[in-house]
Amino acid sequence: DPASATSSMAIGARMGGAEIYRHTQVLDTRLKDTGEWAVVTDKGTITCEHVVNAAGSFARQVGEWVGLDLPIVNMKHHYLVTENLPEMAALDKEPPVIRDPRASCYYRQEQDGILIGPYEKSGAEAWGLDGIDWGFDMELLNPELERLETSLELAAERIPCWSEAGIKRVVHGPITHTPDGGFLLGPAEALSNYWLCCGASIGITQGPGCGKYLAQWMVHGQTEINVRDMDPRRYGKWACGDYAVAKSIDEYQEMYQPVLPGDFRDTGRPTRVTPLYDRLKELGA
């Protein structure tokens, strides 16, 4: 339950002395001559030692205020919730979340219905590449179910009662992705005390860990586990623009596919090459 979890963490944060400003739009972040950060909002300016960019689908635009070009792409994603089903109501305990590589879907119980979220294997689309309107808040996109047809047919084979179910709700909105599917967690390149916690495509399961280890990094200068694979500095300028879009689409479409030995995903290649690349290519490498 994301809403309850978030509310509980907010209560704990306030008990620890944090101040939370709701319905407050951030307009800019600026580095001051003192080395502190000025966070400019529509209700005044807050001066602070550290800034964390955890702006979700807006993270790339927020990063642009300080000169960052973050390899984050918003992908269109659907999930569907069925009407109540007698088969689900008859269960004496909640079944586990299921990830189905064949259908490229996830399934979980939603009250007495089923929630199904497909990651289409082809035809996936990026969204908001030219920026997202700052007023886009808790809004959804119009359903585009045609490209989900194959996944939903395979889901019906996996869960037969789904094929007879009525659809109660279709949710279609943006979800962030990065070229390698990992989020951006840690210090931003060449900026003092500017931290990133964004680009996650699996939010609620990864969120608590992200908060824990980012806090350790900020306070102690290191984390108790190795988070190298999530370090934003694994990317350079080469990873932005068309490369980020192409790889994020590919990553989305391969979300639930097993990585097999010898797999070669040529999307985005060649981007970074050695001085020997052309010669080796001539020789058939």
Language model region names:
Residues 1-50, 58, 208:
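Helical element adjacent to the flavin cofactor pocket in flavoenzyme catalytic cores
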Residues 8, 102, 111, 125, ...:
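C-terminal catalytic lobe of FAD-dependent flavoproteins
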Residues 14, 64, 281:
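Anion (oxyanion) recognition and catalysis
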Residues 14, 56, 67, 215-219, ...:
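Hydrophobic/aromatic-lined pockets within catalytic cores
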Residues 20-22, 53, 116, 166-168, ...:
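General beta-strand structural signal in soluble alpha/beta enzymes
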Residues 29-142, 150-158, 240-255, 259-266, ...:
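Flavin-dependent oxidoreductases
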Residues 69-72, 99, 221-225, 284:
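A short alpha-helix-loop-beta-strand transition element characteristic
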Residues 268-284:
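Long, low-complexity segments enriched in small/aliphatic residues
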